[in-house]
């Protein structure tokens, strides 16, 4: 009897271990950077200012019909050293939430890394790439990070206003799908007024 319980315990432990491995490998793999365009002749001074997050897609983003994602805003403030102070303003738990970080210029114009990355436990790399923008209406930005040895990526569709044309949204969907994301990993946050209009 004790031997039978031991085998049962080992079998359950093995099943739990296999399940844990499955849950860490269920992320859609990040695409190679060769599949992610870079905005030519990126103009850092024109990109700064407030952007509304009109669309979001990523391997850790899932559409929630019962509790849809609320729109938030991100402000890029260009500093003298050509890095950006980046502040995202979100409405959470009935109050305004601010997330502040620094994006440091990378190898090419329009590409950035996260400044002071060591202050983010578990984060080993963080890349930002401006895919396309016309500066005064819309932008598409690709983010990739490695956290706790897991690779996450997302694409953000920014608008200078809360509404963008259906053509721009369709283009965003097409691009997200070209990077391997299915429809349920693509969301269009619900426009709100709280916190993001100040």
Swiss-Prot record:
Transmembrane feature ranges: none
Binding site for enterobactin: 126, 154
Reported effect, residue 154 to A: Strongly reduced affinity for catecholate-type ferric siderophores
Alphabetical UniProt keywords: Apoptosis, Cytoplasmic vesicle, Disulfide bond, Glycoprotein, Immunity, Innate immunity, Ion transport, Iron, Iron transport, Pyrrolidone carboxylic acid, Secreted, Signal, Transport
GO-annotated cellular components: extracellular exosome; extracellular region; extracellular space; specific granule lumen
Secretion signal span: 1-20
Glycosylation sites per record: 85
Annotated localization: Secreted; Cytoplasmic granule lumen; Cytoplasmic vesicle lumen
Gene Ontology terms for molecular function: enterobactin binding; identical protein binding; iron ion binding; iron ion sequestering activity; protease binding
Tissue and organ expression note: Detected in neutrophils (at protein level). Expressed in bone marrow and in tissues that are prone to exposure to microorganism. High expression is found in bone marrow as well as in uterus, prostate, salivary gland, stomach, appendix, colon, trachea and lung. Expressed in the medullary tubules of the kidney. Not found in the small intestine or peripheral blood leukocytes.
Residues carrying Pyrrolidone carboxylic acid: 21
Function: Iron-trafficking protein involved in multiple processes such as apoptosis, innate immunity and renal development. Binds iron through association with 2,3-dihydroxybenzoic acid (2,3-DHBA), a siderophore that shares structural similarities with bacterial enterobactin, and delivers or removes iron from the cell, depending on the context. Iron-bound form (holo-24p3) is internalized following binding to the SLC22A17 (24p3R) receptor, leading to release of iron and subsequent increase of intracellular iron concentration.
Family statement: Belongs to the calycin superfamily. Lipocalin family.
Protein name as catalogued: Neutrophil gelatinase-associated lipocalin
High-level lineage: Eukaryota, Metazoa, Chordata, Craniata, Vertebrata
């Amino acid at each position: 009897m004790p031997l039978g319980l031991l085998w049962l315990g080992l079998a359950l432990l093995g099943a739990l271990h296999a399940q844990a491995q499955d849950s860490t490998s269920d992320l859609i793999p990040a695409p190679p950077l060769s599949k992610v365009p870079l905005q030519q002749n990126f103009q850092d001074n024109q990109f700064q200012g407030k952007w509304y997050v009109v669309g979001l897609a990523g391997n850790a983003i899932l559409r929630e019909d019962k509790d849809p994602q609320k729109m938030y805003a991100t402000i890029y403030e260009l500093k003298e050293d050509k890095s950006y102070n980046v502040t995202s303003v979100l409405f959470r738990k009935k109050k305004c939430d601010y997330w502040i970080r620094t994006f440091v210029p990378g190898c090419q114009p329009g590409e950035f890394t996260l400044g002071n990355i060591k202050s983010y436990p578990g984060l080993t790399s963080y890349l930002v790439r401006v895919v396309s923008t016309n500066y005064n209406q819309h932008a598409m930005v690709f983010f990739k990070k490695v956290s706790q040895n897991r690779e996450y990526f997302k694409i953000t569709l920014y608008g200078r206003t809360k509404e963008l044309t259906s053509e721009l949204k369709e283009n965003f969907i097409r691009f997200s799908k070209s990077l391997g994301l299915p429809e349920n990993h693509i969301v269009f946050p619900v426009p709100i007024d709280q916190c993001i209009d100040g």
